[in-house]
């Protein structure tokens, strides 16, 4: 009986972890699971105002490209938009927006997107938040040669290899940046945030194109922290622009916020339910600093 209970617990934790790190794995949710996550999102009161685009038009692409190019090198921005356009040209018929429009929450038809993507790309699942963020930042941040823990990056690395997204050197740097970080068995976010600050302090970040990370706590195989979602925040004419790829299947989003704090609130409310019993709630990092509310 004890053995069976242990196996059940491992199975539940595995399912929870795959849901928790939303852009870590290709998501094949049941309709019931999707409805549950949507209902959680709908129950959250929105504390921010924003407009968004999936960059599915030339004007929106050029606007976002200009904002990114002001703080990032041309090669990285070009490589990023190659990924954006490949995705949008493949699945853009699934109600992806061009012009910026009012943004509260989005709900995409993952099944339709997958049915468009897979016939063209086979077993290449596409790219996620971490891959795209690294694509933008790789030439403007300094990543030290550290021992890496890429145990939760197996799908990311498989996608990188099958899509020939990065070479060996970039893949190694990617694994270091998004390594799993050891922590303690506590629900105290302050403890985990200090661990993450210590780890990320070893990197030299871009002060203008800022890496905003949602860090999640996992206890499946020891106590650890992991960047479950990430995107890039840059200044724009009207405030700030946040660029993200939601999951392997789900689209790119460029979101305009009036303030950095509004972007922090967006990430905090979107991922606040991605936790479990005995685990700390997710928290936000701005480059190497914990964002406290």
What is the predicted role of each segment?
Residues 2-11:
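Bacterial N-terminal signal peptides that target proteins for export
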Residues 20-22:
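C-terminal motif of bacterial Sec signal peptides marking the signal peptidase cleavage site
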Residues 24-26:
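Bacterial signal peptide processing site
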Residues 30-82:
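N-terminal mature-domain "stem" immediately C-terminal to a signal peptide or N-terminal signal-anchor/transmembrane
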Residues 72-218, 222-227, 235, 239-250:
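Acidic/His-rich structured neighborhood in mature extracellular/periplasmic domains
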Residues 242-245, 258-293:
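Low-complexity, Gly/Ser/Thr/Pro-rich intrinsically disordered linker/tail segments
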Residues 250-260:
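A short, polar/proline- and glycine-enriched secondary-structure boundary/capping micro-motif
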């Amino acid at each position: 009986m004890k053995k069976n209970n242990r196996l059940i617990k491992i199975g539940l934790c595995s399912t929870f972890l795959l849901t928790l790190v939303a852009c870590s794995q290709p998501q094949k949710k049941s309709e019931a699971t999707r409805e549950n996550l949507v209902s959680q999102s709908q129950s959250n009161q929105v504390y921010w105002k924003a407009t968004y685009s999936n960059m599915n038009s030339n004007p929106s692409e050029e606007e976002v490209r200009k904002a990114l190019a002001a703080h990032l090198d041309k090669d990285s921005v070009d490589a990023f938009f190659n990924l954006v356009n490949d995705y949008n040209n493949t699945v853009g018929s699934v109600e992806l927006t061009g012009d910026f429009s009012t943004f509260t929450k989005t709900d995409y038809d993952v099944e339709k997107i997958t049915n468009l993507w897979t016939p063209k790309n086979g077993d290449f699942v596409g790219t996620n938040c971490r891959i795209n963020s690294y694509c933008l930042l790789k030439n403007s941040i300094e990543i030290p040669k550290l021992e890496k823990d890429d145990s939760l990056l197996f799908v990311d690395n498989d996608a990188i290899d099958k899509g020939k997204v990065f070479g060996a050197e970039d893949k190694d740097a990617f694994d270091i940046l998004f390594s799993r970080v050891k922590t303690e068995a506590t629900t105290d976010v302050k403890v985990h945030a200090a661990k993450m600050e210590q780890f990320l302090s070893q990197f030299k970040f871009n002060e203008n194109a800022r890496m905003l990370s949602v860090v999640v706590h996992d206890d499946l195989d020891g106590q650890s922290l992991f960047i479950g979602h990430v995107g890039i925040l840059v200044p724009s004419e009207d405030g700030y622009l946040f660029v993200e790829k939601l999951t392997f299947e789900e689209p790119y989003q460029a979101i305009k916020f009036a303030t950095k704090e509004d972007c922090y609130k967006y990430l905090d409310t979107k991922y606040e339910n991605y936790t479990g019993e005995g685990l700390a709630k997710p928290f936000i990092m701005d480059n190497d600093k914990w964002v406290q509310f």
